[in-house]
Amino acid sequence: MQIRSFVYSLILCCISSTAIAQNSKFSGPYAQFGIGYQTASPSFSNTSLSAAGQSLTPTVSVSNASGFTGTVAAGYNFFSGTPLLLGLGIEYTPFPTSNATASASYSGSVGTYQNSASVHINNSLNIFIAPALALDQNKLLYGKVGYTGSSANGVNTDFYMGGTSLGFGYKQIISSGFYGFAEYNYVNYGSLNRSLSGNLKTPANVSVPATLNSTVTATTTNLLFGLGYQF
């Protein structure tokens, strides 16, 4: 009797889950926009200073950049016949991050050195897949895995940065296809080797050309709230 009850319960759960999937309002194409808060966090490693025929070790300090951000996105959620959906999407961030600043200094028997540079990331484009779970026909939990490419400006040049993006969020239908959402995203842009030219001042007060070399790693996080339309 207990086995029969268990089987009945399992069948009812399967039927209920299938009904949720079939009635989910989040299958098909969608478009959305979001606004929120973003933080860009650069870090530096393997930093060296070449000057006066020597390789010196400078001190590096970094300040993160935080501020307003906004995104627009579009995609398609594929119906799977279960409460699970799979989405494909593209997301564009037109707003640049604030400037993140790095300062390098050296003081020793060879002389003194001081230099700084600012970097900001802009025009980010993220292509992602989004596995999702329909809680009911109006509510959706989802994750995001993708690749983000961005242009960056700083350290006396423009350059490209790209890396893995991860995120998760929640959507809920408000009315007639319109929905609200909340979302958290993380991007790891990997590392790049960058150089910065400057001058080291010797104890005799003579300026000597110096080159700062470092491996730069950058990550960004953002928290978004927004509105969208499910077609």
Give, region by region, the residue ranges found by the protein language model:
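Cleavable N-terminal export/targeting peptides
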Residues: 1-26
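Gram-negative outer-membrane beta-barrel domains
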Residues: 20-231
